[in-house]
UniProtKB/Swiss-Prot annotation:
This is Putative 3-methyladenine DNA glycosylase. It comes from the Bacteria. Its EC number is 3.2.2.-. One of its GO terms (biological process) is base-excision repair. Keywords: DNA damage, DNA repair, Hydrolase. InterPro entries: Formyl_transferase-like_C_sf, MPG, MPG_sf. Pfam families: Pur_DNA_glyco (PF02245). Belongs to the DNA glycosylase MPG family. It is an enzyme of class 3 (hydrolase). GO terms for molecular function: alkylbase DNA N-glycosylase activity; DNA binding. The keyword Hydrolase applies.
Amino acid sequence: MLLPRQFYARDVLIVAKDLLNCYLVREYNGHLLIGKIVETEAYHQNDPACHAYRGKTKRNEVMFGPPGHAYVYFTYGMHYCFNVVTGAIGRAEAVLIRALEPVKGIDIIKTLRGGKSERELLSGPAKLTQGLAIDLKLNGHDLTGGKILYITKGEPVAEEDIVVTTRIGINAGKDLPYRFYLKNNKYVSKK
């Protein structure tokens, strides 16, 4: 079942947890590339690590709503990262999808990733965007439309099966417990 806009129109910390075990689906050249979401990070406008911390810009304007849209950005001059916009319109919030467990289209994902091992295919933000062919053309894409790029419902996850920890690869706000991942999942980027 496709996740509706109401799913995303909630607090970023709730959505970040609830996205775990859901499926990110990418329609690519007539094929479905699917990964189960196993790791997320939450960002909101009052968070110094958030792209919207200093206000709205051309780069981050998608974060200000409406919820349920893709926020894709280019980083380090070589990688894309994929986020899901959450919360109310006008309040910048997004969930970074950090890692996926490959489910379908694995051979195509391997080709897009240059033949990496299955464990390494989608186990990081830049890896998953490369493996699912997500780039700036999908920035602002409506994830509730059910075409090209969208998220479908997964099985709920028990609280005891979710690890809550600090985020990775940031300097500001690094002490905030805004990273969530499925316990004992081998596709998580880092434990």
